[in-house]
Amino acid sequence: MSPDQIGFATLLKKEVMRFWSVLAQTVTAPVITAVLYLLVFAQAMQGRASAYDGVSYTQFLLPGLIMMAVIQNAFANTSSSMIQSKVMGNIVFILMAPIGPVDMFLAYVAAALLRVTCVAIAMLAVTLPFVPLPFEAPLVLVGHFFLAAGSLAVLGLIAGIVAQKFDHIATFTNFVVMPASFLSGVFYSVHSLPPFWYHASHLNPFFFMIDGFRYGFFGRADVAAWVSLLWSGCFFVAVSALCLWMLQRGWRLRH
């Protein structure tokens, strides 16, 4: 193995062990939170709301909750790891290691993808016996899953690089990630919104991630699957380019 490959494998192992050592917090807790949302909203809205013909509200809700958990936990994994390394001062050991910016980028993102894949599989394992879902377009489903998870992992890495203390990460989470994920069509179809909010929803990249993921289950969505895939792909490329530029320059990492 080359020095870069060894550096990548070591950093990836470190990041995986970081979330695996506290599995109750990083995987079990998000699953419990999502199941509680499902129980509360399913009981409150079942029979009163239906987005698609032949699809119950509980079925409609579940893919959105899975994707919301994926979005929030992918962001949390990379952002918390980066800011923790910066605040504690051990980022210097990563920067001194024989690992390039691309390998560093891939290691952080891959660890976040592994974490949210565990979260999604656990949620499906717990809920599918009670809320059966069709899998109409599995390739579309998988594509949107990894685009969304990758985008938020990269966005979390950017936030961790920009932030100088834990409060900055909390601000980004509470004022950007949480509102954007809640207002992205998780609990409702955007067709039920007034015209202004309907069009405003289309400015939210999280909406396309969730809507496209939902299409993978039902073969139906609020916008065409290719549109969601295009927007999600463009968002991933944009944030990845910005993050790689930051890592290459060592912005707020070396100085």
Residue map of PLM features:
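Transmembrane helix segments
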Residues: 43-45, 160-203, 207
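Membrane-spanning helices that line or support transport/gating and their immediate boundary helices
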Residues: 77-81, 85, 154-161, 192, ...
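Transmembrane helix-boundary elements of multi-pass transport/secretion proteins
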Residues: 4, 18-85, 132-141, 171, ...
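Alpha-helical transmembrane segments and their short interhelical loops
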Residues: 101-173, 220-244
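A short amphipathic helical element positioned immediately N-terminal to and/or at the very start
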Residues: 4-20, 213
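Hydrophobic alpha-helical transmembrane segments of multi-pass membrane transport proteins
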Residues: 32-41, 57-129, 156, 175, ...
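Transmembrane alpha-helical segments of integral membrane proteins
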Residues: 208-218
